[in-house]
């Protein structure tokens, strides 16, 4: 047995499923998950000593690559002054200034510890501000594991084949209305059925939890218009897309103005950080200035703020997003060309530093139904054969892949060459 197999066997006796987040268990592809010893740049190194070109990037945060010296040094320096104070710090103010400067639609921002906390808190705030209970989300989109959001969710929920999680009371779920991503007709129908009851729409501007599904040109502007028409707030969940699709996020890339924005992943540089923010009048409803309660013992802790501040300063440097886009486009085009050479039907969606691989006869993949029609079994075989080639992709047909600026042209070419060998075997 390999060391990963031994560790996984031991872990399953102590940790449910052997992992602390379900998708890591390789449930969506089968087999034994890799246990990682270290990471550097664009590479992961497992406990058995094998190196992999990494396109998971810790599920999105590692836009600069692993073990970036600026982030590492910032964490070490901050740790020397103490790990957590439970009191305000100057770095929290500097971080808030930086985030609100980079994302102009955020007049104010509140730091939390995860993307789930960010979306959960933003929805509570929207409900409190509007005095309404119902929310709209989209089929196949994932916004964390809060009860009200585990309704027809994406990400790990799709991998497990569960449209709703046990443990979510029907009384909670009834306030969550699920519409079809990229379908404004379904959204208008929901508003017309509940014109005075919907507090907000929450949406991934690029759906990254049913793989990678970009919005159609009219979709996000249409959501903005419907929210304005019916007096609801628009929450854009940029946990995945923020600082990756563009410096100011997908909202800037697609030209839509939300009322609230949720951030995560890149904002922490690899540390557990989330944030939500937006219009000043809405944020003023948050405690302690307003009646909507939200709190967190470790929110804004100095280590996480130092990591995030260092990361965002690096991400804001000129040329970062152009490089991400060029590398991702090269990978997507190369994979499609390699598949076409042997007659394998393949679609690779990509936006900025995100991409999604779909084995499908369809010409486009634009919604949940398109994603579910793809050949998941072929993806499973592709994943394992690529792993043997030293390429680490997301271990699920329903998860996006992530590029970093640490990936080189050689890494991209080696990945395409590996895919060409794998396609020849399929």
From Swiss-Prot:
Its main location: cytoplasm. InterPro entries: 4pyrrol_synth_GluAld_NH2Trfase, Aminotrans_3, Aminotrans_3_PPA_site, PyrdxlP-dep_Trfase, PyrdxlP-dep_Trfase_major, PyrdxlP-dep_Trfase_small. The keyword Nucleus does not apply. Homodimer. It catalyses: (S)-4-amino-5-oxopentanoate = 5-aminolevulinate. GO terms for cellular component: cytoplasm. It is found in: Cytoplasm. Transmembrane segments: none annotated. It comes from Salmonella paratyphi C (strain RKS4594). This is Glutamate-1-semialdehyde 2,1-aminomutase. It comes from the Bacteria. SUPFAM superfamilies: PLP-dependent transferases. One of its GO terms (molecular function) is transaminase activity. The keyword Cytoplasm applies. Keywords: Cytoplasm, Isomerase, Porphyrin biosynthesis, Pyridoxal phosphate. The modification N6-(pyridoxal phosphate)lysine is found at residue 265. Its EC number is 5.4.3.8. Belongs to the class-III pyridoxal-phosphate-dependent aminotransferase family. HemL subfamily. Its cofactor is pyridoxal 5'-phosphate. Pathway: Porphyrin-containing compound metabolism; protoporphyrin-IX biosynthesis; 5-aminolevulinate from L-glutamyl-tRNA(Glu): step 2/2. One of its GO terms (biological process) is protoporphyrinogen IX biosynthetic process.
